[in-house]
């Protein structure tokens, strides 16, 4: 993390996203934005009007404009492609997984793809099955991509800026439930390194790894459990690829217990991968089974009364950790 002037402000997650875009576009003329309806960014005053010539509104063809971004990256630009909703990743899998992720390997490093794909993960608000997925586990299985899931305003700004400067394709999964939550963000230059986890709360009894939007309920659960004498260490991986294994394993070796809260579906999830790593490399330290708190393997329903109970919650985390004691 770096900062120019030492000033800290409270701004929203949403503001931090576009502050990162603006700063990087002003810093580097190779940075361009591609996506649906994004010309509205300057018209609405979200970005400076002077940046309009580097903002390209595309037709509703995710595979098409992601391909445009890959081509732009090959010519030396640094495109940021806004997929709007994370579920639309499926429509662009060929460009993201088959092209962006592989070209550097297939050319022996002669070609680089400095591209960022932004995908907003929607839940709550009855967005239904076609708009509510969290497909980051699928992309974790695509060698050549970096995957980040920022949970705070400071990290969404710092990770987007670092992603734009990276020569490897990066997919940024933003949780829209965090958009209007505010937090401290350094003013000026601020970078969050990819592949470095953050310990949000120290603890001695249980390691709780919480991904993206699950951070909020994880910290609430840790506070509730502290009143019962249970000390929970909360870790935010921030990056899923590369994953900060030493931070997670070091915590598990101290606490002997691991719980993972992941808002994505259960099977073949980031939670599953973290659990497997701990079982392989820290089994000798474990005092209890590794537990996962995830969304079940079903399409997300439209009805709020059916949707809301699916995600990791404070109550679910507290219940699981109490049973480990």
Q: What is each stretch, according to the model?
A:
Residues 1-173, 176-325:
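Thiamine diphosphate
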């Amino acid at each position: 993390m770096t900062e120019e002037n030492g000033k800290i402000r409270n701004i929203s997650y949403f503001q931090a996203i576009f502050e990162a875009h603006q700063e990087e576009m002003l810093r580097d003329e190779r940075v361009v934005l591609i996506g649906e309806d994004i010309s509205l960014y300057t018209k609405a005053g979200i970005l400076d009007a002077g940046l309009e010539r580097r903002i390209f509104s595309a037709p509703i063809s995710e595979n098409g404009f992601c391909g445009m971004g890959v081509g732009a990256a090959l010519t030396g630009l640094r495109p940021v492609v806004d997929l709007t909703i994370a579920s639309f990743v499926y429509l662009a899998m060929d460009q993201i997984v088959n092209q962006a992720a592989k070209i550097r390997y297939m050319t022996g490093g002669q070609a680089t793809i400095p591209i960022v794909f932004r995908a907003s993960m929607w839940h709550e608000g009855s967005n239904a099955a076609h708009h509510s997925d969290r497909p980051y586990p699928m992309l974790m299985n695509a060698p050549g991509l970096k995957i980040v899931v920022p949970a705070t305003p400071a990290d969404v700004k710092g990770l987007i800026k670092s992603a734009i400067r990276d020569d490897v394709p990066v997919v940024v999964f933003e949780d829209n439930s965090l958009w209007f939550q505010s937090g401290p963000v350094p003013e000026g230059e601020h970078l969050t390194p990819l592949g470095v986890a953050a310990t949000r709360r120290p603890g001695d009894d249980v390691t709780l790894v919480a991904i993206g939007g699950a951070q909020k309920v994880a910290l609430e659960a840790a506070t509730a459990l502290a009143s019962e004498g249970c000390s929970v260490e909360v870790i935010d991986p921030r990056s899923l690829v590369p994953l900060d294994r030493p931070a997670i394993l070091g915590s598990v070796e101290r606490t002997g217990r691991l719980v993972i809260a992941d808002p994505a579906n259960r099977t073949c999830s980031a939670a599953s991968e973290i659990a497997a790593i701990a079982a392989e490399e820290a089994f000798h330290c474990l005092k209890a089974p590794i537990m996962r708190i995830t969304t079940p393997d079903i399409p997300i329903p439209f009805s709020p009364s059916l949707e809301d109970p699916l995600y990791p919650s404070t109550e679910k985390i507290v219940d699981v950790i109490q049973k480990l004691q």
